[in-house]
Amino acid sequence: MKKIQFFDTTLRDGEQTPGVNFDVKEKIQIALQLEKLGIDVIEAGFPISSPGDFECVKAIAKAIKHCSVTGLARCVEADIDRAEEALKDAVSPQIHIFLATSDVHMEYKLKMSRAEVLASIKHHISYARQKFDVVQFSPEDATRSDRAFLIEAVQTAIDAGATVINIPDTVGYTNPTEFGQLFQDLRREIKQFDDIIFASHCHDDLGMATANALAAIENGARRVEGTINGIGERAGNTALEEVAVALHIRKDFYQAETNIVLNQFKNSSDLISRLSGMPVPRNKAVIGGNAYAHESGIHQDGVLKNPDTYEIITPALVGVDKNSLPLGKLSGKHAFNTRMEEMGYTLSEQEQKDAFKRFKQLADAKKDVTEEDLHALILGQSSESHDAFELKHLQVQYVTGGVQGAIVRIEERDGALIEDAATGSGSIEAIYNTINRLMKQDIELTDYRIQAITAGQDAQAEVHVVIKDDNGTEFHGIGIDFDVLTASAKAYLQASGKSKSTSKQADFEEVK
């Protein structure tokens, strides 16, 4: 039975989703959960792209102990050097080098001839091989590349020392039949491929990312790249949970096994959904809210008699626990910490103390603290602990003619308090106009979403906002509170803080 490696790029390609901006602490939390999930390789980022990305890759490389960590690099020596520096503390570092091979990319983006592309591949793969034992090469836009030239580029990379060849369907163009044939062609034409690991990286523009990844595995790929929940730019990437469960359920067909701990998928999905601000569609395969719901009377009757009648995946297989008992104000520290571990959170001793204190405050306000409340509690603690600005006071009042007014006081990281007031056509607009005055910013609110974390009158509100700055960059913010207006203010303030922080970093890079 063949062994399939899982390569997770949630922290790199997944973060290219508009409005998704993970900070260092969030990325480490996600990486630790991916490690529990059994991911073989974590792509932590693109080290040379920014000082922030470099620090994230470096921190993840130091934190992860049981799987490989890799960084992305172009065919540029400086990129490779920067990746080596970022990954020096990794227990099993790898590097992922890419260069486009399609005619449209070579002509309009790279402005390089085929000969120049081949020479660059040869030089930079050889250069990287001197620094890394595992070198992965990706011919970007492979599925739209001339087949003969693609094979020549792959052979060049292997001859120069590449140990992994990843075939990206960069724009989600291919289909399972074509993609499977491509892997057959590579295995037939490439010389000395026995020790080479072939991989797939599929996008979902035509809705076939998972099917294409499985077609690659069926035709010789031994590594699959993707993200949790399928997040990524445009229509997203291959959803790793779908591939892993498909390989498990249809082991009779694929004859493949993995290192994936399937019952960690629910925790992984929940964590990434909340930190990214991207809700999982209820009809999403494997981990959607409706995945194990049965509306039809005939289906319900069948499932009650024998679940196998309509369920090929049991909820427990992917970590969906329908019988999880809520915690209450009498629950102790041990029970709380145990539940945190079961939910996939790795907290330091101080973080455990802070979280338990917040839990007790929450338990005093709610009869039952559910798993959803606990996710929100940790998310709120994580986001507030590194916010550059903290909401200290909010007052909303009716003015005249339907106009609302808001007074907002915030505390900056250095402890300074600033306060201002503004009006708006409603309470939310008044609050956001006031924050804009305080932050001296002119931004566009592109998305506002509110949801109750649990049912009942004592439910907390979770508000997600997305804002866009002058450069068109989007930033996501989360706010959680029993009061909707306070949660809304927290979310907008967090997104604004991220925008300010990125602006300062950009100014630094410009000066540098």
UniProtKB/Swiss-Prot annotation:
Keyword field: Amino-acid biosynthesis, Branched-chain amino acid biosynthesis, Cytoplasm, Leucine biosynthesis, Manganese, Metal-binding, Transferase
Domain Pyruvate carboxyltransferase: residue ranges: 4-266
Catalytic activity, reaction form: 3-methyl-2-oxobutanoate + acetyl-CoA + H2O = (2S)-2-isopropylmalate + CoA + H(+)
Chain residue ranges for the region called Regulatory domain: 390-512
Single GO MF annotation: manganese ion binding
Keyword Amino-acid biosynthesis among record annotations: yes
Pathways per UniProt: Amino-acid biosynthesis; L-leucine biosynthesis; L-leucine from 3-methyl-2-oxobutanoate: step 1/4
GO biological process: L-leucine biosynthetic process
UniProt GO cellular component terms: cytoplasm
EC number: 2.3.3.13
Cofactor (UniProt): Mn(2+)
Pfam families: HCS_D2, HMGL-like, LeuA_dimer
Superkingdom in the source lineage: Bacteria
Residues involved in Mn(2+) binding: D13, H201, H203, N237
Gene3D superfamilies in alphabetical order: 1.10.238.260, 3.30.160.270, Aldolase class I (3.20.20.70)
Subunit and partners: Homodimer.
Similarity-based family: Belongs to the alpha-IPM synthase/homocitrate synthase family. LeuA type 1 subfamily.
Name the record gives this protein: 2-isopropylmalate synthase
UniProt lineage: Bacteria, Bacillati, Bacillota, Bacilli, Bacillales
